[in-house]
Regions:
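Non-catalytic cap/lid and distal C-terminal segments of serine-dependent acyl enzymes
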Residues: 20-280
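Bacterial N-terminal signal peptides that target proteins for export
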Residues: 1-8
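Bacterial N-terminal signal peptides
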Residues: 8-16
């Protein structure tokens, strides 16, 4: 019986190992910011076993006050398991408190250039990703939700799909919050900069026939709920295809832990429809 018990325990251990991928920390160089930026890359467990297989990638952006460890260590601790189940690489960069802009008033912040160009090039060079916007998506929560749509809408040649969870999709009602005035200047003195750095105004630039696949989610008790509703209504008026979900919930990690599951499935369907989940 003891031998059988040991064999059973060993089998369970092997199953547990097989069910999870691995997480690699990298330092991605940024010429724009003259520094290296940390990122965590979450790989499926099949990554090392099949050297001929390439994978689609989802970029996950953290919120204000977070860093590159926030997604896998706090918001979605089983991200490595999902990477294995779905056959997807997740990339979690450190976005500081940048709102993922190239900040006009803070020249050392060029996170739009970093994430949309430098980081993607680094990941594609060093990992077996499918190197196509049809195999690349970006999303995030709060500040990262703003970043997901900001970068996804503005860089459709890089990201074929984008999303937001509880995103600050219109920053203008919050002129004194989250260090935005450090990047944009005071709203009262720089209204045109604030107007040109908010996601809701980027919607006017979208060609409905070329719009990225887009998914937006916000809880009804979230302080960003009204601006997300406004963005949804504007996208409807502009006939821009998107998926919009709202349900009971507040601005908290428990909400995003659940919301990201739906967004991952949305992106997975996008990848499959684009025939990208295959070998290059």
């Amino acid at each position: 019986m003891k031998i059988l018990a040991k064999i059973f325990a060993a089998a369970l251990a092997l199953l547990a190992v097989a069910a999870y991928g691995k997480t690699v920390e990298v330092q991605a160089p940024s010429e724009a910011m003259k520094k290296e930026v940390s990122a965590l890359v979450v790989l499926p467990d099949s990554y090392d076993a099949d050297s001929g297989k390439s994978y689609p990638a989802i970029y996950l952006l953290h919120g204000f006050g977070g860093n590159h460890t926030t997604w896998p260590k706090r918001t979605k601790p089983n991200l490595d398991e999902i990477a294995t189940q779905q056959g997807i690489i997740f990339v979690c960069p450190d976005g500081a408190k940048s709102w993922y802009w190239d900040a006009p008033k803070k020249p050392e912040y060029k996170y739009e250039t970093f994430v949309s160009k430098e980081l993607v090039e680094f990941i594609d060079k060093n990992f077996r990703t499918v190197k196509s916007p049809k195999a690349r998506a970006i999303t995030g929560f709060s500040m990262g939700g703003h970043g997901g749509l900001w970068l996804g809408i503005r860089h459709g040649d890089v990201f074929g799909a984008c999303g937001s969870m509880s995103g600050g999709v219109d920053i203008r009602p919050f002129p004194s919050s989250w260090a935005m005035k450090e990047s944009l200047g005071a709203k009262s003195e720089n209204p045109e900069i604030w107007d040109s750095h908010t996601v809701i105004n980027e919607a006017d630039k979208i060609d409905p026939s070329k719009a990225p696949a887009m998914i937006i989610d916000c809880g009804t008790k979230d302080f960003f709920y009204k601006v997300n509703q406004a963005l949804h209504e504007k996208l409807l008026r502009l006939n821009i295809p998107h998926e919009y979900t709202t349900r009971p919930g507040a601005h908290m990690h428990e909400y995003w832990n659940n919301a990201v599951d739906f967004q991952i499935l949305f992106f997975k369907k996008f990848f499959e429809a684009s025939n990208t989940n295959n070998k290059e």
